[in-house]
Each structure stands twice: as structure tokens, then as C-alpha cells.
Amino acid sequence: MDNSVTKKRAQSNEIDMLNGPLFKKILLFALPLAASSLLQELFNSVDVAVVGHFVGSRALAAVGSNAPVIGLLINLFMGVSMGACAIISNHIGQQDDRSIRNAISTVQLVALLSGFFLLVLGQVAARPILTWMGTPPDVLDEAVTYLRIYFLGMPFIMAFNFGAAILRSMGDTRRPLYILVIAGVVNTLLNLLFVIGFGMGVAGVAVATGIANAVSATLIIRLLRKEKEPFRLHFDRMKIHGVELSRMLRIGVPAGVQGMIFSISNVVVQSSINSYGADAIAGSSAALNFEY
């Protein structure tokens, strides 16, 4: 253990939560975090808005009905990323460089494995889940297309969220927000290009979202590759450290399960709406997508 961590945390984007009055620092930390959460939720909302305005009600139903399914499948891993943030923050407070390195090494590999697990799960489970939910036949194929393309980007989504967890553990909630703003602009512009310019419909908004997620992942990885030690990413050091993984899961899994429970209720509601047909799904998607 050494105290070199505190000497390396003077960057302007980082908030030192260990010294000085807390109220202002909590606000400076929490407001960008809340804005980041809102921007991530808006990704699907932008997809819904574009297809609803430029494609039609069936496409709107196909995209909008997927929001609770996406939440259900990824919330557990979002909780694990919260656990990662908590344990790295704890090591920073203890000024334990070695444990920070071990935790970040573990986080890197967990992000990679969870991303590819979700990618495969999305390809295999998309049609069975949407069929089980009673998605109408005239919507089902487009809904499956959207969900499968969306889940091709899961490695990027996991890379961003776990990378953001590392930055947030350092007291930096601003740079993840800046990255999400850039990705949001990319997503919106590509949505319009692919839907209006290329006529790609539902597939177009899914591809646009995937590219935007790739942009956010690339940017956050570049930031972390340039961080000072012990926070720098090293691809050749990816390794699961059992103690760090256990701590991460102990904190993160309950948070993830809590998010999944909320998503399950949304899936049940969506299944009920599906029984009324495509027009009902489109109407509810336009109204309820912001709630998800």
C-alpha cells in the first residue's frame, strides 16, 4: 500500500470526495451522473421518435416494444458495473494502488465477457422472448431485427458502462457525460441518415445506435488508456482476481436484480399491450418509452 493515489488525483475533471465540505462536491458529482443516465435512456427514445415520424406506426411498435426487453437483459450487468465503481472507490479511499490495479484488471475482463455473453443471448433469445410476450405477427419480424442488431453492440455498451464506472470511482462524472453527448449527437444524425437518406427503417435506427455505442466505447477506452497509474487500462493485464470479483458481485448483483424486477413489471405490462395489436403498441411506445 502507498499513498501515491492521492497525488495522482488532481485532474480538473475529478472531484476529491475525501477532503473539504461535501455538499457542493456531491452536487458536482451527482448532476453529471443524473444527466448521463438520462442521455442513455434517450438513445432508445430517439430511435422511437425517428421511426415514428419517418417510417410508420408498425416500425414504431417494433422499436418501442423492445425497451423493456433491453432493460430486462442488461440491468443485472449495469448493477455489476455499480459494484465495480464502489470497490474501486473503496480502494482509492484506502490508498491501495495494488488493489486498484487488480480491480481494474477484473473490471476489464468482466466487461468483455458480459458484453459477448449478452451479444450471443440477444441473437438466440430475441425471437423466443418477443414471441412469448405476444408480439403481433405483423410487428414480430421487425422487432426481432431491431433487437438482434441492437445486441450486436452489447460489447460496446458494456465497455462504456464499466469504463465509466472506473472514471466515476475516481470522482469524474463529467467525462462520461461529455462522451454520451457526443454519442447522442452521432446517434441522432445517423438515425436520420439511415432512415431518411438510405430508407433502412427499423434496421437503420438499430445500426445507428450500435455505431453510437461503438463511438462511446472507443472514446472512454482511449481516455482510460491515457490515465495515470494505477487507473490506466492495460489489455495485457486482463485477469479475474477472485477477491475483487466477489466484492463486485456482492455489491452489484443486488442492485442489478432490483433493476431487473422493475424491468420484469414493464415486460408484463408490454405483454398485455401487445395483445391489442400494432396500433396499441405504437401508441403506448410513444407515450411510455420515456418512462422506461
Regions found by a protein language model. Give the residues of each.
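Functionally critical, cavity-lining and gating residues within the transmembrane helices
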Residues: 43-44, 78-82, 122, 160-161, ...
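Transmembrane alpha-helix boundary and packing residues in multipass membrane permease domains
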Residues: 33, 37, 49, 86, ...
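Alpha-helical transmembrane segments of multi-pass membrane transporters/permeases
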Residues: 111, 166-189, 207-210
